[in-house]
Amino acid sequence: MALSSSKFSSFSGFSLSPVSGNGVQKPCFCDLRVGEKWGSRKFRVSATTAPLTGVIFEPFEEVKKDYLAVPSVPLVSLARQNFADECESVINEQINVEYNASYVYHSLFAYFDRDNVALKGFAKFFKESSEEHREHAEKLMKYQNTRGGRVVLHPIKDVPSEFEHVEKGDALYAMELALSLEKLTNEKLLNVHSVAERNNDLEMTHFIEGEYLAEQVEAIKKISEYVAQLRRVGKGHGVWHFDQRLLHGVHGA
């Protein structure tokens, strides 16, 4: 099929080969536009070899906006993507919560490790709790860096060093304090989760659910049982037996 070169409608997806005088077809890829004149040469229209399947993903085109968005300014994260400022801020707050909880537990460890208190099982339990919350803080710090946020450490509040209680005794009082602390930590974690949901950050919600919430519920259940048992034994000889169960890791204490 031969077409004159005066005026053409626009064609897409076709290769056009100019026909020489001897009828030999030469490769040529052109766009035909309305009103454009191409001289006296004739063109043959034929389908290209590439199938017209419809392009749904053009990586070099679609990456342009992300490539241009990659910061070149020093101290600006290259990894950050879809990470809201509110999410970054609440993670820093939770880091502070975990470090404060660790600090309280470390003070409890020091108290029960004294020579005139000498409840080694309680000291062991509270030291392990302190280390666990510190690990939680460090995990949050690592996550913050992974998402391209910036870790900002807030001040840690002073904590008491004496935990004797006239009515309850130090063991029960300390364990009730631990229970309140775990419940408060859980509330703070739920707030972190809600902030992630509000900002449609699915990765962050999965991180908090998988790494913290289930473990926190288990901790609350365990310490609740400890409080119930200590309320039964009172302040006397039963506290020593309970301490020994904590020290040797006996199931149920």
Curated annotation (Swiss-Prot):
GO cellular component terms, A-Z: chloroplast
Residue positions binding Fe cation 1: E98, H136
Domain Ferritin-like diiron: 81-234
Pfam families reported for this sequence: Ferritin
Keywords assigned by UniProt, alphabetized: Chloroplast, Iron, Iron storage, Metal-binding, Oxidoreductase, Plastid, Transit peptide
UniProt binding sites for Fe cation 2: E182, Q216
Top-rank taxon, per record: Eukaryota
Cellular compartments annotated: Plastid, Chloroplast; Plastid
Chemical reaction(s) catalysed: 4 Fe(2+) + O2 + 4 H(+) = 4 Fe(3+) + 2 H2O
EC number, as in UniProt: 1.16.3.1
SUPFAM superfamilies (alphabetical): Ferritin-like (SSF47240)
Main location: plastid
GO biological processes: intracellular iron ion homeostasis; iron ion transport
Region described as Extension peptide (EP): spans on this chain: 48-80
Any one GO molecular function term: ferroxidase activity
CDD domains registered for this protein in UniProt: Euk_Ferritin (cd01056)
Record-linked Gene3D superfamilies: 1.20.1260.10
Targeting presequence: 1-47
Family membership noted in the UniProt record: Belongs to the ferritin family.
Role, per record: Stores iron in a soluble, non-toxic, readily available form. Important for iron homeostasis. Has ferroxidase activity. Iron is taken up in the ferrous form and deposited as ferric hydroxides after oxidation.
Quaternary assembly: Oligomer of 24 subunits. There are two types of subunits: L (light) chain and H (heavy) chain. The major chain can be light or heavy, depending on the species and tissue type. The functional molecule forms a roughly spherical shell with a diameter of 12 nm and contains a central cavity into which the insoluble mineral iron core is deposited.
Entry protein name: Ferritin-1, chloroplastic
UniProt organism field: Pisum sativum (Garden pea)
The organism's taxonomic lineage, starting at the top: Eukaryota, Viridiplantae, Streptophyta, Embryophyta, Tracheophyta
